[in-house]
């Protein structure tokens, strides 16, 4: 497993420091994608329809070959579908799980292999939570 690095505010992306309450610390596993890429956030339901899945996969597959980074959470549903479609299309992804980045803390547990694949494919996982913190109701 790729090591987890603690970033200080001076290492954060500039835009993150412009929000009203930026995190004091960020943890990253993997490497940040190139800054000159376009970042596309994908969000959706955990309880998706077959139509939602098909459209998500089709849209992301159509981005193959472009300098685009797919950004999403690590939840079941559209988040996971977006990451898998992006990886299949050769795109880099970034994931923001609602937990720490240790495999023992990642939620849902059945997405630890997906998290590893994201990192191994040149993407990253980012969290403001300490590495061993498990997901809670509102994280």
Please identify what each model-predicted range represents.
Residues 1-139:
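Glycine-biased, small-residue-rich flexible motifs in mid-sequence functional cores and linkers
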